């Protein structure tokens, strides 16, 4: 900018000087013509190569004009160069603004994590827990440690909306054989966004308190919103591609003799679950329509090989309430980090259903995974014996059951029971059901 101004000043000086010289010359020539005697004037032949005073004046005027025009041309040239640079910048900005929407699919944001097949997955266990849940958490840790983590250790991240007590941290650190990390949730991730009418939300909770489970709970709604849209943004998870969600009071019934994270990575799976179930419709009256409206506005996010048939029996017109139970998730964090999911969550969040209804993170995660991913990227861990009150996932395959020293009752397996969505999942994926699956429907 300084150089540009200096050049302008130089051009102005040159032009001003030329004008002054011209005026002085004209004045001088005028006086000269007045005082030249006619005899001297007649003695010179101005047509034989010499220049008359009048012609000299004209010549000097022309020279001054040329000098001025040259300076102006130079200024225009540099102005043009400056304009060109500005135009280029504006053009680039315009092109960027008019550019088509990013055509990357959700999988394009996930596949880079598959490239690490030769190395250990960037993975961790993650638990959102309160200090008062220490006893239940230690029970869960014991199962995870004995069934898998001692054989295939990974870091464990513990998150809380309040500071962990020293007692809590000491007990957990002692119980976990691998690295542990403790994190606090940012306040804005566990509070009301500015667009939520808190008076209205409180009235809805009061009315729902006796109508359905957690209907009157404020903290449960914050938890569902956090698990839906924020846990994967926590700074302690930034270095990881994979996570296994573990909650207090869960059980693992069988030995897990392989690295599940490595299996997910090598087989290019994105979302894994153990239990599928129907949601309480009264808690999510507008979730499906809101989701379908989002898909209509953003059809590019709907994967062509999606798992819509798991969610809907009429190609999306209505929701059959099926979802993956999110208290157990082994999944790729980049699914939630993708533009599709970020925009989807933002749409849901502004709709207000986490507070005005009681939208759970399980149906939110399930709808997104089933629609944004190719269906072959979703995996049912039928070999992992798992319990979260009150349901069990118990391997029905006898060989798997025996070889993994399973301790569960196969008769209690929830997969094909009436309230489960195991049948819907098997049908949607084209999987062959166990021979005795129908007995669980009785």
From Swiss-Prot:
Gene Ontology terms: cellular component: fungal-type vacuole membrane; Golgi apparatus; Golgi medial cisterna; Golgi membrane
Catalytic activity, EC: 2.4.1.-
Region span, Disordered: 68-95
Any Pfam family matching the protein: Glyco_transf_15
Lumenal topological intervals: 31-442
Transmembrane segments: 12-30
Annotated active site: 329
GO biological process terms held by the UniProt record: cell wall mannoprotein biosynthetic process; N-glycan processing; protein N-linked glycosylation; protein O-linked glycosylation
Gene Ontology terms for molecular function: alpha-1,2-mannosyltransferase activity
Function: Mannosyltransferase that transfers an alpha-D-mannosyl residue from GDP-mannose into lipid-linked oligosaccharide, forming an alpha-(1->2)-D-mannosyl-D-mannose linkage. Required for the attachment of the third mannose residue of O-linked saccharides.
Protein name: Glycolipid 2-alpha-mannosyltransferase
């Amino acid at each position: 900018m300084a150089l540009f101004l200096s050049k302008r000043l130089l051009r102005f000086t040159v032009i001003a000087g030329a004008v002054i010289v011209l005026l002085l010359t004209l004045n001088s020539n005028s006086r000269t013509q007045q005082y030249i005697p006619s005899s001297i004037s007649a003695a010179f032949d101005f047509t034989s190569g010499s220049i008359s005073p009048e012609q000299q004046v004209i010549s000097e005027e022309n020279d001054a004009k040329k000098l001025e025009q040259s300076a102006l041309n130079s200024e225009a040239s540099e102005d043009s160069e400056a304009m060109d640079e500005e135009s280029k910048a504006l053009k680039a900005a315009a092109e960027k603004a008019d550019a088509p929407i990013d055509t990357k699919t959700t999988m394009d944001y996930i596949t880079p994590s598959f490239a690490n097949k030769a190395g250990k997955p960037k993975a961790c266990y993650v638990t959102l827990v309160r200090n008062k849940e220490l006893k239940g958490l230690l029970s869960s840790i014991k199962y995870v440690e004995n069934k898998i983590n001692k054989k295939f250790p990974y870091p464990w991240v513990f998150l809380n909306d309040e500071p962990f007590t020293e007692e809590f941290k000491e007990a957990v650190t002692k119980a976990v054989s691998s690295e542990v990390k403790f994190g606090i949730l940012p306040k804005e991730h566990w509070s009301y966004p500015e667009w939520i009418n808190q008076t209205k939300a409180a009235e809805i909770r009061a009315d729902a308190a006796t109508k359905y489970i957690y209907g009157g709970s404020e903290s449960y709604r914050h938890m569902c919103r956090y698990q839906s849209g924020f846990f994967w943004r926590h700074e302690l998870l930034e270095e990881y591609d994979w996570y296994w969600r573990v909650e207090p009071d869960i059980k693992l019934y069988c030995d897990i003799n392989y690295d599940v994270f490595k299996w997910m990575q090598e087989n290019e799976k994105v979302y894994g679950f153990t239990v599928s179930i129907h949601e309480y419709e009264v808690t999510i009256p507008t979730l499906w329509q809101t989701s379908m409206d989002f898909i209509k506005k953003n059809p590019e996010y709907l994967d062509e090989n999606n798992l819509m048939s798991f969610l809907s029996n009429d190609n999306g017109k209505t929701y059959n309430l099926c979802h993956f139970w999110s208290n157990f998730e082994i999944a790729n964090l980049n699914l939630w980090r993708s533009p599709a999911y970020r925009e989807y969550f933002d749409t849901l969040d502004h709709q207000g259903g986490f507070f005005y209804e009681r939208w759970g993170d399980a149906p939110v995660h399930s709808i997104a995974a089933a629609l944004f991913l190719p269906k072959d990227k979703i995996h049912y861990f039928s070999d992992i014996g798992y319990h979260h009150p009150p349901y069990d996932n118990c391997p029905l395959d006898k060989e798997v059951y025996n070889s993994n020293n399973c301790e569960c009752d196969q008769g209690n397996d929830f997969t094909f029971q009436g309230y489960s969505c195991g049948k819907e999942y098997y049908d949607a994926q084209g999987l062959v059901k166990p021979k005795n699956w129908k007995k669980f429907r009785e």
